[in-house]
Every structure is written in C-alpha cells, then in structure tokens.
C-alpha cells in the first residue's frame, strides 16, 4: 500500500520542503508539466507526492485522504476542529516561521494585556452600543484563545477578506488577530501586539493524518525526515 505525501505547490515553502526531503535522502522527481500536481521519489515506488496549497494540505490531512503533509501549524489548527484528534505533528521543519497574534491600535495605551482587553470588551457595548469587533481569518483560533483560554465573551468576529491589518483604520473592525513574521506590517498600520497576545508560534511542520499515524511506513518516513533535520 502506497503512502501519499502532500507538499506545498509553489514558492519558498515548496523549495525549502524539497530541500528538507533531499537532506533526508528523498529525491523528488518533478513532472515536466507544471500543471501536473503529482511527482515521484527516486527509489521509493510506494511513496507518492501530491502538490497542493498549504491550506488544502491541512484540509486533506483532516479528511485522511493523504497520509503525510507539509503545512503550517497555524493552518492545521485553524482548518481542523479538534485538530489533535485528527492529525499529529511529526516534526517542526525550521522554516515558515510566523506568529498568530492579537493586535490593537497603538492609541489604546492602557491596553497591554488580555486582561486589559477583557475590561475593554466588557465596557465596549455600554459605551458604543455594540460588541468589540475583531477582524481575522483565524476565527477558530481566536474563539479558542479569547473564550476558552481567557474567558472573554463579549466580542464579535468580523471575517477578513482582504488585508486584515487595515481593518481598524478602515473602520470595519476595532482590532485584529493576524499572522506576522516581523511585525513591520502591524507597526506600519499603527497596531501593537499585546504582551500575552501570541496565540500560536507557527512554522512549517510535517504532519500525519491520525488514521495513518501508526502505519509502519509512515513512521519510517517521518523518522527519516526527522533524522535529516539533525544533520
């Protein structure tokens, strides 16, 4: 029975993933046609490569339609309800670093922690006649962090379809939850990250579908990739 490994289909994530695999001794033979999203690995007839977007990889792992995949931890945890029951992180790959953070306008000088934000959220409806609005593409992670971890209930998530960091200035939200690598875009939009507002420190990971997690072949591939990372 063959194992399907899903890889990012383009950009630096694809390049860095192929380099990690080669370091582990897996030489991916790319197709001649760029529209062909399947590839093979030299000398590994039972290992199939499938190229997908990082978000598609997270979803397909959750469905169990691929055995292994390389995607961001943020995407796995945001895309999949009860992610730990559906997938397992086999290795952190050391690239694609980014943090999912809670950011508020710099002019909110008295708001530096989630506890401060809880006070603001409770007071916001009375003062403004509406709930605090949070723009984000990460509604699942936001709900878990606000409601379950910090007990903040009085807020409303505004789906972000464009540049999330611009939502407060545009008036469509009061604050944001977004992903950032350097923080420069947040600063350019006069936003600040709360002191305890890092929801997740994400990076590219090798992830297995839970249904495949105990497969001897999947374990062997994951172990070989982990060993390659230590070279």
From Swiss-Prot:
Keyword Cell wall biogenesis/degradation attached: no
Gene Ontology cellular component annotations, sorted alphabetically: cytoplasm
Main localisation: cytoplasm
GO molecular function: ATP binding; ATP phosphoribosyltransferase activity
Pathway this chain belongs to: Amino-acid biosynthesis; L-histidine biosynthesis; L-histidine from 5-phospho-alpha-D-ribose 1-diphosphate: step 1/9
Catalytically driven reaction(s): 1-(5-phospho-beta-D-ribosyl)-ATP + diphosphate = 5-phospho-alpha-D-ribose 1-diphosphate + ATP
Coiled-coil stretches: none
Assembly and interaction partners: Heteromultimer composed of HisG and HisZ subunits.
Database matches in NCBIfam families: hisG
Function per UniProt: Catalyzes the condensation of ATP and 5-phosphoribose 1-diphosphate to form N'-(5'-phosphoribosyl)-ATP (PR-ATP). Has a crucial role in the pathway because the rate of histidine biosynthesis seems to be controlled primarily by regulation of HisG enzymatic activity.
Name of protein: ATP phosphoribosyltransferase
Species per Swiss-Prot/TrEMBL record: Brucella canis (strain ATCC 23365 / NCTC 10854 / RM-666)
């Amino acid at each position: 029975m063959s194992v399907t490994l899903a890889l990012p289909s383009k950009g630096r994530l694809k390049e860095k993933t192929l380099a990690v695999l080669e370091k582990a001794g897996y030489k991916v033979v790319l197709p001649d046609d760029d529209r062909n999203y399947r590839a093979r690995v030299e000398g590994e007839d039972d290992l199939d490569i499938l190229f997908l977007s990082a978000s598609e990889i997270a979803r397909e792992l959750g469905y169990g339609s691929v055995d292994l995949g390389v995607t961001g931890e943020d995407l796995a945890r945001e895309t999949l309800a009860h992610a730990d029951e559906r997938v397992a992180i086999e290795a952190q790959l050391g690239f694609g670093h980014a943090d999912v953070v809670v950011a508020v306008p710099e002019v909110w000088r008295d708001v530096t922690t989630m506890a401060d934000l809880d006070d603001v959220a409770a007071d916001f409806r009375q003062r403004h006649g509406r709930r605090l609005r949070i723009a984000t593409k990460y509604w699942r992670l936001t709900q878990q962090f606000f409601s379950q971890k910090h007990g903040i209930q009085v807020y409303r998530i505004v789906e972000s379809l464009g540049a999330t960091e611009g939502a407060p200035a545009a008036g469509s939200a009061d604050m944001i939850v977004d992903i950032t690598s350097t923080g420069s875009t947040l600063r350019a939009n006069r936003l600040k990250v709360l002191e305890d507002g890092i929801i997740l420190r994400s990076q590219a990971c090798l992830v297995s579908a839970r249904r495949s997690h105990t497969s001897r072949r999947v374990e062997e591939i994951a172990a070989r990739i982990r060993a390659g990372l230590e070279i």
